[in-house]
A protein has these predicted regions:
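Alpha-helical transmembrane segments of multi-pass small-molecule/ion transporters
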Residues: 18-197, 231-240, 244-275, 279-323
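Hydrophobic transmembrane alpha-helices of secondary-active transporters
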Residues: 1-20, 189-204, 210-235
């Protein structure tokens, strides 16, 4: 799934966003990460204990930095408790719905935000035009049965190779004393890098990639969630409080960054939703400001998918310090 998901993450296309939009997105991802890390020791016991929840929390951060596909990928890369993962999924769903509603409500206050931050929107239209042109190239091609069959075969081959390489990498890292890099982590890192490289080849232009990765995602998330019992969800309320605390830290820090770098609310909101919801959700917020901004939202979501696995693994290494 990871490999297919990343085939659409061509960094050459992401260049259409320009450095300013990429910085806004990274600002969102980093401020969310600060919230996760700073609040985790305060909530760890209420969530079920640091030793039981650090993996699921890192997986949730991967989702909030790039989308649900990254969260599913972390299930193989990190030791994720099924009960904690179920609670994290509940939090992901609750915060996603609430966050979309709040950011849509905030549209009418954009002028006040922009005035307070002295926002610079002079180049926004040019970036939007370039992003929309790039997105239009992909939507004009329709997949056929041959594309689906080829992708199924390709993913099976890549899976076999990745499992073998993961074992070899794990043996190497054990030899140099890096215990964090177990077989699952090594496999995830390898297949992520392979996917990003292949995205810049003709494989990245296959028309069935988006649909195929979505099918994989729904299947994997459903299977993972089905392993948890309903009793595990009783701790979900504290997960929701933890998530709201993270969002509060995120908003405060983003406002400070916007004041310093003169970022506008439209792109702040689009980047924030691109982090938590991916390329399917970001255009909703972007087009609430201007219909021509949809392409920016899509490309921001693609950027999140590309880096979400690495950010999730990094957060896992940090949260494990509290165990």
């Amino acid at each position: 799934m990871i490999f297919v998901m990343l085939l659409r993450c061509d960094f050459r296309k992401l260049g259409k966003l320009g450095p300013r939009m990429i910085c806004i997105f990274m600002g969102c991802a980093i401020t969310l990460g600060i919230g996760f890390f700073a609040l985790f020791p305060l909530f760890a016991n209420a969530l079920g204990g640091a030793d039981k929840t650090w993996g699921a929390t890192a997986a949730l951060y991967a989702s909030w930095a790039g989308g649900s596909a990254n969260m599913a990928a972390m299930e193989d890369a990190l030791p994720v408790d099924s009960g904690a993962y179920s609670c994290a999924l509940a939090l992901d769903t609750a915060c996603y719905s609430l966050w979309i509603a709040l950011l849509l409500f905030a549209v009418k206050y954009a002028q006040k935000w922009n005035k307070a931050c002295k926002a610079d929107t002079s180049k926004l239209d040019a970036v939007a035009a370039a992003a929309n042109e790039e997105v239009a190239k992909e939507t004009n091609v329709k997949p056929n049965a041959a594309d689906w069959i080829f992708l199924i075969g390709l993913t099976l081959v890549v899976s076999a190779i990745s499992q073998y390489i993961g074992v070899q990498m794990n043996g190497f890292f054990k030899g140099v004393g890096l215990s964090f890099f177990d077989k699952g982590t090594c496999t995830t890192v390898f297949v992520t890098i392979l996917g990003l490289i292949c995205a810049m080849t003709p494989l990245g232009k296959l028309p069935a990639v988006t649909e195929f990765s979505s099918v994989y995602l729904y299947a994997v998330v459903s299977l993972i969630a089905s392993t948890a019992t309903l009793i595990d969800l009783l701790s979900a309320p504290m997960w929701v409080v933890y998530g709201l605390g993270i969002r509060l830290v995120h908003v405060v820090l983003m406002f400070i960054l916007s004041k310093v770098f003169h970022w506008d609310l439209c792109m702040d909101s689009t980047a924030s939703v691109a982090c938590i919801g991916g390329s399917a959700s970001a255009p909703i917020i972007a087009t609430a400001y201007d219909g021509s901004f949809a392409g920016i939202g899509v490309l921001m979501g693609v950027l999140g998918a590309a880096i979400g696995n690495f950010l999730g693994l990094g957060m896992g290494a940090l949260l494990k310090l509290f165990v």
